[in-house]
Amino acid sequence: MAQQRAYRYFDLVMVAFVTVLVCSNLIGPAKIAQVDWPLLGPLTFGAGVLFFPISYVFGDILTEVYGYGRSRRVIWAGFGALGFAAIMAWVIVKLPPAPFWHNQGAYEIAFGSTWRIALASLIAFVCGEFVNSFVLAKMKILTAGRWLWTRTIGSTIFGEGVDSLLFYPLAFYGTGIIPNDKLPLVMLSQFVFKVGVEVVFTPVTYKLVGWLKRAEHEDYYDRDTDFNPFTLKT
């Protein structure tokens, strides 16, 4: 049996990925923000979208350095953490408050996401992340490891596209929270914003990828990888 490589920083990148994922989904959605941009005017968005794209940056780093197989395990770890956070929030919100505690309403607003939104978030996350990782791994082979920016941005376009196409209709269609005729505009604006974050972080991604490849003595190519998402093999 082949001995598994021991990596110095893989677990830290995994923790960073899961932390950004859970925090952006648990803390961010409760607040709707509006920022006035020069020339563009006011932009309204769910606050979680500000940080969620960073999970794609870490996803790109994981696949680029360690390969699809290890990235797949991290995606499922993130899925489990996000699912547990959703269940925990639901249970705590449903607990009857003490008679002297008068903050139940505010707590429900902050952490009382409906099951429809929570389920939509889980489905969109896992599908989008696997598409992102798959596209990056395949593009790395096609480009022979050159032009990292084409892989990070290209894979994010596909991954975030799938995420947005799944999340917004599954979470909001027919609910009245977002009018049905406004959903395409909301999806497009959020998609453009998320891809823009990836573009802005490209220099940081280059630095981290280069440093990790040197530190780990690893630059994985998924030439013989089983891309089945429903396995934990590395």
State each model region's role.
Residues 209-234:
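Short, highly charged, low-complexity non-transmembrane loops/tails of multi-pass membrane proteins
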Residues 1-16:
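N-terminal membrane topogenic signal
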